[in-house]
């Protein structure tokens, strides 16, 4: 099968969607399919051979974060050329309804199209503003996937339609078999708690963790907090400096270091306040053997089976987080029982299972298709029609 994957977000810096697209591409290639990925990337950025860079991206505020996208008539011409030259049996778009490569590809492609929806949000001025333009395009997506119930809810409430839920994937063995790093390995006397996220994004919850550290150390004085991720977080650093070597900032870490961190830490803490549709890092931490302590946002409740495969605390409440961390660090027998349940839970998210489900959607779409993907001639006039809607405030 010839599959064209479109990632809206830049490969210059990996996030959850980029990793999902990369891993799916490599799993499909491993199974013998032909795959081409279209994604924003600078010419100087090293990318896998199967990635076709679409050019420089620009930062756009979106859903409490910064998305790096590219969009416009020049990019649109590149998308049409990629569609025409790819001779794809099927095109699979990620986040097709944000102003990005995916939206351009949806307009450009005529034929079997699958769309995956990753975003979860309560309300969006941008989605409401653009819905008159994009809702008619929904009919072009013959197979719709949402990565979680929250992502499906967002699609249904904002744009109508429906989608089958297929979760994000993780290579479980990669994390389960990673080696421990002695710098990060906890002991009964000095257990380690890991945080990973963009430090300057408030919704990732570092301020919540920073406010809880003192109370945890008052009860578990040997605890060590390992804070990984890019960003300055000046206020939080100043607050945490008072705890000396009980808190270590690791900076940005590689995928290999992330796997070792989750294999080494006793607890992984996810204090996000919202804007998460799934929680892929929770699954990675569970696969690595860390006990997950997470805020009780809907996406995290789903991943942790309502607290059976991890521990939940009240969102945005440092005192609740501190109490939950103290319990996790103090009751080691109970924590090990939770870890055992988590090891079973994560198997449903392994790429071997997730790819089977995605291929099932592909088969359904292709069973009703009358021709492979080709360029939609109407796409040559699309930019003018989209421009007015997409230049409005987004999210």
Label every model-predicted segment:
Residues 41, 150, 169:
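Carbohydrate-associated surface elements
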Residues 41-42, 196, 222-237:
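Glycosyltransferase donor-sugar binding loop
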């Amino acid at each position: 099968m010839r599959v064209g994957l479109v990632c809206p977000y830049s490969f210059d810096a990996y996030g959850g969607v980029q990793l999902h697209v990369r891993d799916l591409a490599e799993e499909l290639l491993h199974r013998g399919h032909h795959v081409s990925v279209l994604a924003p990337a600078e010419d100087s950025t090293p990318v896998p051979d199967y990635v076709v860079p679409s050019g420089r991206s620009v930062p756009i505020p979106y859903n409490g974060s910064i998305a790096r996208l590219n969009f416009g008539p020049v990019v649109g011409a590149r998308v049409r050329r990629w569609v025409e030259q790819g001779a794809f049996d099927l095109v699979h778009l990620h986040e097709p309804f944000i102003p990005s490569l995916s939206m351009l590809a949806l307009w450009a492609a005529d034929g079997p199209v699958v769309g995956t929806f990753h975003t979860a949000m309560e309300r969006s001025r941008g989605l409401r503003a653009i819905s008159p333009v994009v809702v008619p395009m929904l009919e072009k997506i013959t197979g719709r996937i949402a990565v979680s119930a929250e992502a499906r809810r967002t699609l249904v409430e904002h744009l109508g339609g429906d989608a089958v839920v297929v979760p994000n994937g993780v290579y479980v063995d990669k994390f389960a078999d990673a080696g421990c790093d002695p710098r990060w390995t906890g002991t009964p006397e000095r257990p380690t708690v890991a945080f990973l996220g963009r430090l300057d994004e408030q919704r990732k919850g570092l301020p919540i963790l920073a406010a809880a550290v003192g109370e945890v150390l008052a009860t578990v004085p040997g605890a060590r907090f390992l804070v990984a991720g890019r960003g300055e977080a000046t206020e939080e650093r100043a607050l945490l400096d008072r705890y000396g070597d009980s808190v270590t900032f690791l900076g940005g870490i590689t995928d290999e270091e992330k796997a070792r961190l989750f294999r080494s830490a006793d607890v992984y803490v996810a204090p996000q306040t919202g804007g998460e549709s799934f929680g892929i890092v929770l699954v990675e931490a569970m696969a690595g053997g860390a006990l997950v302590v997470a805020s009780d946002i809907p996406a995290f409740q789903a991943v942790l089976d309502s607290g059976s495969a991890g521990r939940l605390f009240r969102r945005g409440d440092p005192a609740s987080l501190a109490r939950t961390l103290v319990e996790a660090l103090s009751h080691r027998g109970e924590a090990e029982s939770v870890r055992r349940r988590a090891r079973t839970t994560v198997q449903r998210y392994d790429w071997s299972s997730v790819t089977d489900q995605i291929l099932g959607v592909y088969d359904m779409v292709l069973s009703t298709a009358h021709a492979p993907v080709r360029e939609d001639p109407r796409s040559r006039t699309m930019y003018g029609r989209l421009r007015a809607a997409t230049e409005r405030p987004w999210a």
